[in-house]
């Protein structure tokens, strides 16, 4: 993580030299914008008595905030606010800076100090998708409010971290994916891009108690084609919904935190719903789906890291700059609400996340875990707006709910996993995720379960939107059976214990049957195509070996 001391202009110039060469205007094409009917537009008036001072709202500006404008805005904030420090956590694939804004009452930015200052930390990540600018603009707006002291004394009770633009290349080109075609919000387990690795580093270093991931959803497009309607909600919200989440954490998200967000929207005259989408490729399929259950989205990855975690989506994709004030205001209200909720009882929040981390680490070798699951089907009432008249259209839709996950594969929770010595790529990714991995110094006979490969086939990943991204849609579908055995000659093997707070993240990475796993994505070596059967270089440890002397 490169420290960027904004108070020293020469160092700032050096740190942002590559970014400063980018053009002043983002490549937004107004000709591709969907124009709403007057009846639809009437549902989304400009918020009253709200001042919008971020770069996209400059008089006469027709596009969105450029990289250069964002950096200049941040620089001016940092120069005027002792509470704000800024670090550049990475350079994008095309060389643009990814800044992290760190707000503390005392003006410190050290992860070690923040971990000891007795306050919970809220992380806001915006614009993982480059063509979803409202989240990034609201992040700047909320940062400005914090910098100017307009959020009261919240910094006496919480720390706030903001990544206002996680995908600066996508923002510059006004495209959803990263420069290499990867969907950043499906890359938080595999870490195939510098952008996802940067976010992982922030998560590892600062251990946020609360994480908010800010996006925008498609307004027209497939909604018009399928329903002759457009989306009518201001904001769609969903907490983490993935396999093996801590029950107390899940209950807190589904209860008080969900309620706080919804009440904040209603208090400002904004319409909200649980998040849902529909397949953009199979237009004959009118099923509506909540956000997925995979561990690769930031919302779910943060949950597996024992953080209160929410996805926020506001209307925006495809409508250009229409209703931009209202879209940004909706995002701002959510960001403010999350910080206020954290500040309302900071000690209780810290106790919750501390207890969850301890509970997860203490679960090694106990009970069952869900290896593979799927959302359950049902019905759900939603309201869209007639695309021509704007009249509300309320109906009961076929629904795929991530709030109830149906188990497809369950297994006993092991004490940990062993990886063969040559599986360095998997070890490196686990460590980049913040996982503790140890190398065995001595050979011992270790009771294990071996993964025998029953079948291998190439397939396409499932995504509730129809595709993962421009790339990253393919995977190897693996089925295995477990064979109890004893592994000998283990000196040099890698041991990944589940007696650590990231245990459920480890399970998501190493159990082979899901589309996000290291096995399905080729990080862990598969048997060659010529082998009719084989085993994986990965074993489940069935007894506690952490207490064996001189093993590590």
Predicted features and spans:
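Structured catalytic-domain cores with a bias toward divalent-metal coordination
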Residues: 2-8, 26-552
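Bacterial N-terminal signal peptides
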Residues: 12-20
């Amino acid at each position: 993580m490169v420290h960027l001391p904004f108070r020293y202009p020469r160092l700032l110039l050096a740190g942002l030299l590559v970014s400063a060469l980018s053009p002043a205007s983002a490549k937004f094409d107004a000709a591709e914008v969907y124009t709403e009917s007057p009846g639809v537009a009437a549902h989304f008036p400009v918020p009253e008595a709200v001042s919008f001072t971020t770069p996209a709202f400059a008089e006469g500006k027709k596009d969105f905030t450029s990289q250069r404008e964002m950096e200049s805005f941040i620089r001016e904030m940092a120069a005027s606010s002792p509470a704000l420090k800024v670090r550049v956590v990475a350079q994008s694939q095309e060389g643009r800076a990814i800044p992290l804004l760190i707000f503390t009452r005392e003006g410190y930015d050290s992860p070690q100090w923040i971990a000891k200052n007795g306050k919970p930390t809220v992380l806001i990540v915006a614009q993982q998708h480059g063509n979803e600018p409202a989240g990034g603009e609201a992040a700047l707006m909320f940062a400005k409010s914090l910098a100017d002291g307009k959020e009261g004394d919240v910094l006496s009770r919480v720390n706030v971290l903001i990544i206002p633009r996680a995908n600066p290349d996508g923002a510059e080109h006004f495209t959803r994916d990263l420069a290499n075609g990867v969907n950043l919000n499906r890359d938080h387990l595999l870490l195939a891009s510098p952008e996802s690795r940067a976010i992982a580093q922030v998560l590892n270093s600062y251990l946020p108690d609360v994480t908010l991931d800010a996006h925008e959803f498609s307004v027209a497009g497939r909604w018009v084609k399928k329903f002759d309607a457009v989306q009518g909600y201001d904001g769609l919200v969903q907490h983490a919904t993935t396999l093996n989440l801590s029950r107390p954490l899940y209950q807190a998200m589904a209860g008080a935190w969900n309620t706080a967000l919804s009440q904040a929207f209603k208090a400002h005259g904004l319409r909200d719903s649980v998040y849902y989408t529909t397949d953009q490729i199979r237009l004959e399929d009118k099923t509506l789906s909540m956000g997925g259950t995979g561990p690769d989205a930031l919302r779910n990855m943060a949950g597996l890291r024992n953080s209160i975690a929410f996805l926020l989506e506001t209307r925006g994709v495809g409508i250009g700059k229409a209703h931009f004030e209202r879209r940004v205001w909706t995002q701002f209200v959510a960001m403010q609400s999350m910080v206020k909720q954290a500040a309302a009882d900071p000690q209780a929040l810290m106790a919750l996340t501390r207890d969850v981390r301890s509970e997860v680490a203490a679960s090694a070798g106990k009970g069952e875990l869900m290896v593979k699951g799927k959302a359950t089907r049902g019905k759900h009432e939603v309201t869209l707006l007639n695309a021509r008249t704007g009249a509300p259209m309320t109906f009961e839709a076929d629904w795929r709910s991530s709030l109830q996950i149906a188990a497809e594969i369950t297994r006993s929770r092991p004490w940990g996993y062993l990886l063969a010595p040559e599986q360095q790529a998997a070890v490196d990714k686990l460590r980049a995720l913040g996982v503790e991995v140890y190398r065995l110094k001595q050979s011992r006979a270790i009771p294990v379960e071996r993964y025998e490969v029953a079948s291998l086939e190439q397939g396409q990943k499932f995504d509730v939107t129809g595709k993962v991204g421009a790339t990253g849609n393919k995977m190897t579908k693996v089925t295995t059976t477990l064979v109890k055995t004893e592994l000998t000659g283990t000196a040099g093997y890698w041991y990944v214990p589940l007696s650590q707070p990231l245990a459920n993240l480890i399970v998501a990475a190493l159990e082979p049957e899901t589309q996000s796993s290291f096995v399905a994505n080729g990080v862990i070596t598969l048997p060659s195509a010529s082998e009719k059967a084989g085993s994986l270089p990965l074993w489940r440890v069935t007894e506690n070996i952490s207490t064996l002397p001189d093993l590590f």
